[in-house]
Amino acid sequence: MKKLGFLSLLLLAVCTLFACSNQKNASSDSSKLKVVATNSIIADITKNIAGDKIDLHSIVPVGKDPHEYEPLPEDVKKTSQADLIFYNGINLETGGNAWFTKLVKNANKEENKDYYAVSDGVDVIYLEGQSEKGKEDPHAWLNLENGIIYAQNIAKRLIEKDPDNKATYEKNLKAYVEKLTALDKEAKEKFNNIPEEKKMIVTSEGCFKYFSKAYNVPSAYIWEINTEEEGTPDQIKSLVEKLRKTKVPSLFVESSVDDRPMKTVSKDTNIPIHAKIFTDSIADQGEEGDTYYSMMKYNLDKISEGLAK
């Protein structure tokens, strides 16, 4: 009996110690800055700067369209609890069904106090024939120089909210900017070597304007932005007629859109689809393109490869 009593006390002590340890860890985790990012690209850039210093939640799932999204209860909860929220801005989450505008309003969050546009400072490009607020092209991250601006804005806000980890954020930012800068330089050299008559990136959505400007590669598309009609017969006909006047060797289709319209274009022009590329999302974890850096490297490699045919 004494032996049983001793074992019971020992078991109780171990359980108590384990519970206290878990409580301590939970308390430690709860002390971390709670950060929400609207999509996988912004979340990955944030992760590269913050590492394990924050508790990070990404709203729009990998592979989904961030233009028009319906937040889940978990997204609403995390946004309400967040110390800091990062969104793209320039008409991405606030255009279309304006899902982000509704989300932060319901969570009683204030702009430039609780939530910040990571695109602040980007040289904005507008939709074709437009130059007014609400008509911006949101895909600024497809220019690596803008990706660097995103990273700098994220680091700035993290330091403001969490000055105790300033040294970590600054160190990680420096290393990340150097990495993106090297890839940007490599990209410019690659596209300089492609013959001008072959230089045109053809995609479903007209989301490569920033890419085109940065790397001197004109773009063409079926529809301009995912909030409008996608892949109508007139849109397809217009692109087919344009391509028949060119020597473009390859077409591309985005990983987050229906590939059927581009397959029709390919059939009607006899121009092959060279590869799927990334635009609004990174890849699933463990797959090629599962970070912002690797997504951009994959795109640059596939596009230059396809146009060099």
UniProtKB/Swiss-Prot annotation:
Spell out where lipidation (S-diacylglycerol cysteine) occurs.
20
* Stated name of the protein: Metal ABC transporter substrate-binding lipoprotein SsaB
Quaternary structure annotation from Swiss-Prot or TrEMBL = Homodimer and homotrimer.
GO BP, sorted A to Z: cell adhesion; metal ion transport
The yes or no answer to whether the keyword Transport is present is yes
Q: Pfam families given for it?
A: ZnuA (PF01297)
Q: Which gene encodes it?
A: ssaB
Tell me which species this is from: Streptococcus sanguinis
How does this protein sit in the membrane? Lipid-anchor
Q: What is the lineage of its organism?
A: Bacteria, Bacillati, Bacillota, Bacilli, Lactobacillales
Ligand binding (a divalent metal cation): 67, 139, 205, 280
